[in-house]
Amino acid sequence: MQHYHFSHSLLAQQEKPYRFPCPAKLNLFLYINGKRQDGYHELQTLFQFVDFGDWLDIEVREDNEICLTPELPSLKNEDNLVYRAAKLLQQKTNCALGANLTLDKILPMGSGLGGGSSNAATALVALNYLWNTQLSTKQLAKLGLMLGADVPIFVHGHAAFAEGVGEKITYCEPKEKWYVVLKPNVSISTATVFSDPDLIRNTPKQSLEQLLNQKYANDCEKVVLNHYPEVEEILHRLLQYAPSRLTGTGACVFAEFNDEESAQLAFQTIPKNYFGFVAQGLNKSPLHNMLAKIS
């Protein structure tokens, strides 16, 4: 299992292309407070990164071409968030440089782990560094929001409490627990979950302090379990070991443990026909840890 570990000497000697992490995220809780007139939902959610995810290899080109490999089976390159992020940064900064981008995709799509958003954020943050385009984190987050609601969280690179439609962000320091994360063999459309008439949409807003000091939950869970028995089955299995719930709109579920040994013991009992991993929660993104060491 590949986790993100960096030493200063390793990075100093790193050959091109540079290799940047795109960590997964978990929604430790997710509450839906209402639906706005524009169709978007008001949320309160707590994001934390985990020490596991995709990789993006980047080689700077002297021309302004953006080349992304490999092309994902279900997605044209022009629609891939990595490609779109690179083009957006290039256009907004009038950068004359280009890049060869190679995405090592480990996280499944439609999983609730934020893989696509993390890929886009890594492209923005890493290219801003390599191209020396000198945008601030705030400016990069603004570009990220044009690509997806979760992208700014990954751009900021810090565990955070998000409100509204995800645009109001408060940095947070939840406990860095160990997680078993599993994905049943289904993909779930976020739009389908949010349009379901049975979705809870009226959870009262609470302060961050109140939310952090009560049992965590996910308002999307009931709808997802009703429609996807595979998710229900895997969640029940995890609940035998530890507090467990859905992340985002699924399909992934996670169980939280206080130490790695307990998490590994539970993980070893799970049938191997699921995508899954054990990883520690991180309040600072591995991407930002890496950049802090090489800049």
Curated annotation (Swiss-Prot):
Active site: K25, D150
Involved pathway(s): Isoprenoid biosynthesis; isopentenyl diphosphate biosynthesis via DXP pathway; isopentenyl diphosphate from 1-deoxy-D-xylulose 5-phosphate: step 3/6
Positions bound to ATP: P108, M109, G110, S111, G112, L113, G114, G115, G116, S117, S118
Record InterPro entries: GHMP_kinase_C_dom, GHMP_kinase_C_sf, GHMP_kinase_N_dom, IspE, Ribosomal_Su5_D2-typ_SF, Ribsml_uS5_D2-typ_fold_subgr
Annotated EC: 2.7.1.148
Keywords of the record: ATP-binding, Isoprene biosynthesis, Kinase, Nucleotide-binding, Transferase
Swiss-Prot/TrEMBL GO biological process terms: isopentenyl diphosphate biosynthetic process, methylerythritol 4-phosphate pathway; terpenoid biosynthetic process
Transmembrane segments: none
Recorded superkingdom: Bacteria
Reaction it catalyzes: 4-CDP-2-C-methyl-D-erythritol + ATP = 4-CDP-2-C-methyl-D-erythritol 2-phosphate + ADP + H(+)
Gene Ontology molecular function, alphabetical: 4-(cytidine 5'-diphospho)-2-C-methyl-D-erythritol kinase activity; ATP binding
Family, similarity comment: Belongs to the GHMP kinase family. IspE subfamily.
Function of the protein: Catalyzes the phosphorylation of the position 2 hydroxy group of 4-diphosphocytidyl-2C-methyl-D-erythritol.
Protein's name in the database: 4-diphosphocytidyl-2-C-methyl-D-erythritol kinase
Gene: ispE
